Amino acid sequence: MFTINLLLLITPALIAMAFLTLMERKILGYMQLRKGPNTVGPYGVLQPIADAMKLFTKEPLLPSVSTTTLYMAAPTLALTIALLLWTPLPMPYSLINFNLGLLFVLATSSLAVYSILWSGWASNSNYALIGALRAVAQTISYGVTLAIILLSTLLMSGSFNLHSLITTQEQSWLLLPSWPLTMMWFISTLAETNRAPFDLTEGESELISGFNIEYAAGSFALFFMAEYMNIIMMNALTTTIFTATPYNMLTTELYTMNFMTKTLLLTILFLWIRTAYPRFRYDQLMYLLWKKFLPLTLALCMWYISMPMLLSGIPPQT
């Protein structure tokens, strides 16, 4: 039964990831006054299938100087972690209901650093290694901000459980009392998933794209799949933490539709930002985190800790 549930979770997530690539191209096309993919199938609907066939039927290339085991393991690890992150998400039922669901998400997402580091180091290419080091520095740096923001939401909900977090929002979304945290969370998720304007680790428009420069065919596709899976997962997590709809207001089917609509809107915002903003410089990226976001999130976290203590001394106003 667990295997069937696992397949029922993974298969729709993979299908959504495939068509997210098509949606991205279409949105980028229309924003640049062109049509995007429109040849393969009606209105280009079969383009993701054509891309998958092209990538997975190519001969896998292995650089002669690479460390074979780590080189092949890195993309597999990236996709495995991306799929593993979906297990505690309430949609409205989670595959595994962890009491420490938020901690599991935070710890597992941090493991993605290893796949990037392995890919850069095992390629034995200077360009790939430089890209991997920058990616690791960026991911770890923004992981700090994400952890502090999660701690602040825990103080409001009183539990690490994602289902309890939804119950907390019966009266109002956490977005309303913590909108500065929500804005910083959203920008940090852009950096965590290596999306524009923070796509310094994997510049698709550059000759040297980043840590995956030596990858081709199926192994490259696995990195690509992991990136888009993480985008959808991060937006689903944002929906759960800040704009969740309580279970008792909707039926299961309506809850799922509501949840996916919010996730889709956030994902479209990801793509819109890619179209609208140029890439940041690396020093600007680090300055934004260490000089702006980190002090602000720490100050807000202290605020959420101290306010209940201050208010506890006020007598009841009856």
UniProtKB/Swiss-Prot annotation:
Keyword ATP-binding among UniProt keywords: no
Assigned keywords, A-Z: Electron transport, Membrane, Mitochondrion, Mitochondrion inner membrane, NAD, Respiratory chain, Translocase, Transmembrane, Transmembrane helix, Transport, Ubiquinone
Coiled-coil parts of chain: none
Localization per Swiss-Prot or TrEMBL: Mitochondrion inner membrane
Alphabetical GO biological process terms: aerobic respiration
InterPro entries listed in its UniProt record: NADH_UbQ_OxRdtase_su1/FPO (IPR001694), NADH_UbQ_OxRdtase_su1_CS (IPR018086)
Lineage: superkingdom: Eukaryota
Record-annotated membrane-spanning stretches: 2-22, 70-90, 98-118, 140-160, 173-193, 217-237, 253-273, 294-314
A Pfam entry, by short name: NADHdh
Single GO MF descriptor: NADH dehydrogenase (ubiquinone) activity
Membrane topology type: Multi-pass membrane protein
EC number in record: 7.1.1.2
Key word Transmembrane present: yes
Top EC group: translocase
GO cellular component: a single term: mitochondrial inner membrane
Catalyzed chemical reaction(s): a ubiquinone + NADH + 5 H(+)(in) = a ubiquinol + NAD(+) + 4 H(+)(out)
Function: Core subunit of the mitochondrial membrane respiratory chain NADH dehydrogenase (Complex I) that is believed to belong to the minimal assembly required for catalysis. Complex I functions in the transfer of electrons from NADH to the respiratory chain. The immediate electron acceptor for the enzyme is believed to be ubiquinone.
Family statement drawn from the similarity comment of this UniProt entry: Belongs to the complex I subunit 1 family.
Protein name as annotated: NADH-ubiquinone oxidoreductase chain 1
Source species: Sapajus apella (Brown-capped capuchin)
